[in-house]
């Protein structure tokens, strides 16, 4: 009899067969599930602490998605030959898994939970992110932790006007949509997508299609839990302190109401801090008078936050003005300025209300492309977008350093929004880096990065296919009443039930990201929200088009210029030289950057047109074919007993035999030639090994013959 209580469930899912198993591996974890999708195998584990730490006032969930290089049959690079810090892809996938799981833990559950997913085997055609999300959901479901799942997930492509479930990587290349959707049996919780200017109804259809198809995975997880699940935890939320809630409401409700009449963010934040401090102080006085212990600040803070949420939500649902005085459909005032930084290649300052992004575009060469060593193989990225949000953007102090998960995620969202509207590499040969520096933030800074990024690219002279704008939307739902909010503030993001970001052109959507915190948001509500988002996007596009009608026709004087020439691929090694000596000398002496592709396309880039012209001339000289009959003015490099080595072109030498110098017999070559002497020679022979024979006397004989043919003058 086996020592393992192994449970396996298999199901057909689109074009793939999926296998879930639990009970054999990682048995000391709270829950562990292995997911196998056509040889892409992940191990998802969950460990939950049995109790919360004293004073804990938030839910400490961590999700780590880790790719092992052995899964692709590789050994890691680097000195230590082992996996190091998470890659950007691992960080983004960790966020992708975290987002639909987090809202399904019950309110008041503050026990630490850690989800770790290891990628153990990779089929290059099957991305591991969807199996990882399914595995994390299944591991939580079998663990018995208080979790209102399970969660299903699906990737949806759109090929030839049809939706495709969980496409392969090759299918994704032909698709105009890459959408990941996750949710429960009843509701969608998360959407992440990149699209090629698709209409809203196609995007919504993809979400609905994905939600329908993921039910197969959810059913399989239910079956796995029935046979291999652990007993459910006997966890109950701490009973609400009704007396404390009543007292805090009595002390603070009026002041909180007054605070939310202040339209300026800084003034409102100051007032709210005063209310929090005054309420805590008053409660401490009450406790001292009664001889009891006052409630801790975290508990009081949670009660105050709930009161804030009720105030803001009820005002909006009752049709009253929002926090900053707007109605539900109005976009904040927009100011646009381009060319703000004198020596950058392109720059824009995009301000929407109290959110501001300073965005800079830099043009580079092929050598500046990012080389990514992924499990499925190495590839290059010609377009990079990096998002930075320092603490001063919200008037706070904090750590400044390497980007956090949030910054990496926001940067990727902005990149998704812009990438489909960039010119192809054939149309515009530059590599491109965009950096968004958030200088002020009060909601929707990632969408400000999209708008500012588009404007900075146009300022840099990048011929964009269309203007791209982004807008962040919110939603508040109470029973049958709901309100969709255009261009949400930071506070509305925290207090709402859904936030979603839509970016696109006049023609359609290029990126859509949704995070839904509650169940019960229907297709009809999402339809209304997307229509209202389109209205807001069109308004912003109008402002952007008025400010910048199109890309600059001239590149910045500080941006590199490029010329491209084609050489015989067999001559590439001559241009590079032994150990790179020739190309290194070329770049240093001409001040250029030179990239050579395997098919012989040479790209020369420099801010100096003279340097580019010189580099081009020298490369043409190196790669020119030496043909019989051509005449060159060469330099004597070396004298030998039987002749001289003459340099014709850089890297091209020939032999001038002693018998080919003059017509008479030469006893001592030194009587006729010196090293460094310029000599005119004709190519009389070449062979398959590239050896060249030269003649000087042939030119003398030709000159004599032409003179004898000339009739005497009268």
UniProtKB/Swiss-Prot annotation:
Residues binding Mg(2+): 493, 499
Signal peptide per UniProt: none
Xref: PROSITE patterns: KH_TYPE_1, S1
Superkingdom: Bacteria
GO CC list: cytosol
NCBIfam families registered for this protein in UniProt: polynuc_phos, PRK11824.1
Record has Nucleotidyltransferase as a keyword: yes
Record-annotated S1 motif domain positions: 629-697
Catalyzed chemical reaction(s): RNA(n+1) + phosphate = RNA(n) + a ribonucleoside 5'-diphosphate
Ranges where the KH domain occurs: 560-619
InterPro entries with a match to the protein in the record: ExoRNase_PH_dom1 (IPR001247), ExoRNase_PH_dom2 (IPR015847), ExoRNase_PH_dom2_sf (IPR036345), KH_dom (IPR004087), KH_dom_type_1 (IPR004088), KH_dom_type_1_sf (IPR036612), NA-bd_OB-fold (IPR012340), PNPase (IPR012162)
Function: Involved in mRNA degradation. Catalyzes the phosphorolysis of single-stranded polyribonucleotides processively in the 3'- to 5'-direction.
Protein's GO biological process: mRNA catabolic process; RNA processing
Membrane is among the record's keywords: no
Entry keywords, A to Z: Cytoplasm, Magnesium, Metal-binding, Nucleotidyltransferase, RNA-binding, Transferase
EC number: 2.7.7.8
Identification of the protein by name: Polyribonucleotide nucleotidyltransferase
Protein localization: Cytoplasm
Cysteine disulfide partners in this protein: none
Homology family: Belongs to the polyribonucleotide nucleotidyltransferase family.
A GO MF term: magnesium ion binding
Transmembrane segments annotated in the record for this chain: none
Cofactor: Mg(2+)
